[in-house]
A protein has these predicted regions:
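Hydrophobic alpha-helical transmembrane segments in multi-pass integral membrane proteins
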Residues: 79-84, 130-142
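Hydrophobic alpha-helical segments embedded in the membrane of multi-pass proteins
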Residues: 45-48, 66-74, 93-107, 121-129
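Alpha-helical transmembrane segments
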Residues: 83, 106-115
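Short, amphipathic, aromatic/basic-enriched membrane-interface segments that mark the entry/exit
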Residues: 32-40, 57-61, 91, 111-120
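Membrane-helix boundary elements
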Residues: 47-87
Length: 170
C-alpha cells in the first residue's frame, strides 16, 4: 500500500516526494483507487457517494466524519509544513489507507459512537489525531482501526460528559 511504501522509504532515508515519484503514486490515482492497496482503500469518490447517500437518508450525522477528516487535514498540514520531506501532507493522508472508509462508515457506527454532537466531535478529533500519531510515529503504517478502537473505549466517558439534556417529565 502507499502508506507502507512511504513508511519503508522514510526508514531507508528517503523523502516523501521522492518516494511518491519513484513509485509512480499520484493523488488522482489515489482518488480513483487506481493503485494497489488493501480492501479499505477503495475509490474515495465511491466511498464519498455512499457517505452522501447515508447523509441524505438521515442514517448518519456528519459530525464525527467531518471532525475526523478535519483533524487529519489540519494536523498533517502542520507536520508537513514543519518537515515536508518526512511527513505526508493532508491530501495524501485523506486519500490513503482506510481513512475515508473509517471516517465515513466505521467511526459513525451507532453502537460504538457517542450519542451527543459534542461527544461525537471530540470522538472524531481523537480518532483523527491518534490515526496520524500512529502513521507518523508508530511501527504500523495505518492507524485508523487502532484509533477507532482506542476512542471506542472513551465513549462511556464522553456520553457522561456530554449527555443530552432531557426536556419535560416522564
Amino acid at each position: 500500500t502507499p502508506l507502507g511504501v512511504i513508511k519503508e522509504g522514510l526508514m531507508q532515508g528517503g523523502d516523501v516526494a521522492g518516494i511518491m515519484a519513484e513509485n509512480g503514486y499520484s493523488y488522482s490515482q489515489m482518488l480513483l483507487a487506481n493503485i494497489g492497496g488493501s480492501a479499505g482503500e477503495a475509490s474515495a469518490i465511491a466511498l464519498l457517494v455512499g457517505f452522501v447517500y447515508l447523509l441524505v437518508r438521515k442514517v448518519i450525522k456528519p459530525w464525527i466524519t467531518l471532525s475526523v477528516l478535519g483533524t487529519v487535514a489540519v494536523v498533517s498540514l502542520i507536520f508537513s509544513l514543519i518537515d515536508p520531506a518526512q511527513y505526508t501532507g493532508p491530501l495524501f493522508n485523506l486519500l490513503s489507507g482506510g481513512m475515508i472508509l473509517g471516517a465515513c462508515f466505521m467511526a459513525t457506527d451507532y453502537v460504538t459512537s457517542p450519542m451527543s454532537t459534542k461527544g461525537g466531535i471530540v470522538f472524531g478529533v481523537g480518532i483523527g489525531f491518534i490515526t496520524l500519531m500512529i502513521r507518523y510515529f508508530g511501527a504500523y503504517p495505518e492507524g485508523m482501526s487502532f484509533a477507532i478502537l482506542i476512542m471506542n473505549s472513551t465513549v462511556p466517558l464522553l456520553n457522561r460528559w456530554f449527555h443530552q439534556k432531557k426536556y419535560g417529565r416522564a
